[in-house]
Regions:
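Gly/Ser-rich oxyanion-binding loop with an adjacent helix/lid
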Residues: 1-76
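Glycine/serine-rich anion-binding loops at beta->alpha junctions
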Residues: 1-15, 183-199
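C-terminal nucleotide
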Residues: 37, 41, 54-189, 199-202
Length: 202
């Protein structure tokens, strides 16, 4: 649906799960995810591995990647948290975004590429760890603040790699909307970002 909701991955996971159940293949959820990923990367979609996380359903799951290795950990919030997913009624090109961000690997050729590596490396690792702790504590205020921080770093480091897609005017209008501020703790873009969807902590 081109909104950053992993919709193509959801179809791939559903297909893998259907084959698993119909033919009693005895695959784990991780096995279904791997089949779905291998199937999807043969298409123009070229999704990342995170998209197959939809296989876990409505549970909060931390996914850590190291090359082709994937580690998962279920996170149990201390209390309910409320998220709002917003269709920005604009457009994004995930394939182009990922193509441009991937130019930063394996070697950074300039300052923009170094910034992307900084963002997706140490900055991301620190914010994700803090977000995990906020989720476990059920701390919506802290989680919202971390989303805002993550978005600011994304704007600083990733947007220059693909400004046509990552300037995201519709997303930033929502995040800066004065009438919305009393009702949310913070928010950010979804997935590879762009003007597909936004996510807010209410």
């Amino acid at each position: 649906i081109k909104k950053g909701h992993s919709s193509s991955a959801a179809i791939s996971v559903l297909t893998a799960r259907a084959f698993n159940r119909v033919y009693d293949l005895r695959l784990t959820v991780r096995g279904e995810m791997e089949l779905a990923y291998q199937g999807e990367i043969t298409t123009p979609s070229r999704c990342g591995r995170m998209d197959q996380g939809c296989a876990f359903g409505d549970r909060a799951v931390l996914m850590e990647f190291d090359g082709d290795r994937l580690a998962t950990e279920e996170i149990r919030p201390a209390k309910d948290l409320h998220f709002v997913i917003v269709d920005l009624k604009a457009k994004k090109d995930t394939v182009e975004i990922l193509k441009r961000l991937n130019r930063s690997y394996p070697f950074a050729e300039g300052e923009v590429e170094k910034g992307v590596q900084e963002l997706l490396g140490p900055v991301n690792k620190r914010i994700v760890q803090q977000a995990k702790e906020a989720l476990q504590a059920g701390d919506a205020c802290r989680l919202g603040a971390l989303m805002g921080e993550a978005q600011a770093f994304f704007d600083r480091y990733a947007a220059p790699a693909c400004p046509e897609e990552l300037t995201s005017p519709a997303l930033h209008r929502v995040l800066a909307h004065e009438a919305l501020r009393p009702h949310v703790w913070g928010g950010k873009g979804v997935g590879s970002q762009g003007d597909g969807s936004g996510q807010l902590v209410a």
